[in-house]
Amino acid sequence: MTIKKRLSAALAVGVLVLAACSTGSDTSGGGDDGGGGDDGGQAAAPKKAEDIRIDVVTHASPGDSFWDVVKSGAQRAGTDLGIEVQYNNDPDPGKQSILIDNAMADNTDGLVVSMANPDGLESSIKSAVDNGIPVITINSGIDDWQDFGAITHVGQGEKIAGETAGEQLNDAGVKNVICVIQEAGNVALEDRCAGAKKTFNGSMENLQADNTDLQASQATIQSKLEDGSVDGILALGGDMSGAAVRAVNAAGRDVVVGTFDVNADVAQNVLNGKLAFAIDQQPYVQGYLGVTGVYLNIINGNDVGGGQPVYSGPAVITKENAKEVALFAKNGTR
């Protein structure tokens, strides 16, 4: 029930955001009519949509299909709102912080930032906030967005999502699982494994892999499968789940594989039974609502979320509901 309530709240916020977009556009358009008279002490009229640029800066690695969906959501929001959206990414926190600083120097109107390594981005994000630039964090960073001065965070509670995965593994009847972390130092991924360990009734060991080298990661996973007691794998990303499935096939083992995050291949693998489940945080929602929330703050002073995060997940994808998800995944929106 807790997960359903969180998802219902997230959908409710999303509906309010989209409804507010229409109101915000009307307010922006009407601002020109109220500029005269004796109200010289009022703040300047809000910017018109066509004059707004929002920069999305993520920690995505090159070729990561998950972030292609986030980018698509952000760009669709830009199209729907009639604003410019710039997208840049770098998995190195030092370089990501430079991208944030560069956006500020180039007079961005707002920022949407993922925080896989909050400590590495703290200075840049706080500097943006101090300079009056509205910031919303997405995906990673749910424990730090308030301290950094962001409006809200759009994503899932990673520990809660991990707990959900642990329960799914219990339902699958496995006893000895490896949790594959594909990005070193990513606090969200560490939280997923920690959450899964909390609810999983068996034993679980973390395994470090590399999402930028899936072939090597497959070999790393396959080597762990030489231990005959390992009967489950929890992948933390869609691309890594593919490497896990291939490792199981190559090892000739009967091993249950579950994953976080959804793409077209993941949806198909759930349908054909190669994956037992997928935990979906809906990355398209993160990109779309991140941009929309910043836009609303710029044109109408709205603070989306009311001081709380906006939950985009977790949702559980199984064979029972994967067919519908697969249709959207083929479009690059799930």
Regions from the PLM with identified roles:
Residues 97, 113-130, 196, 211-268:
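Hydrophobic alpha-helical
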Residues 21-42:
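Bacterial lipoprotein signal-peptidase II cleavage site
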Residues 41-81, 86-102, 115-118, 181-191, ...:
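Extracytoplasmic "Venus flytrap"
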Residues 65-80, 161-165, 187-204, 243, ...:
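Short, solvent-exposed amphipathic alpha-helices that sit
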Residues 96, 152-177, 215-218, 263-266, ...:
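Hydrophobic alpha-helical segments within soluble ligand-binding/sensing domains
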Residues 1-25:
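Secretory targeting and sorting signals
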Residues 119, 123-160, 263-271, 275-276, ...:
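Flexible loop/hinge segments that line or gate small-molecule binding clefts
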Residues 12, 43-46, 50, 199-202, ...:
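Hinge/cleft segment of the Venus flytrap/periplasmic-binding protein
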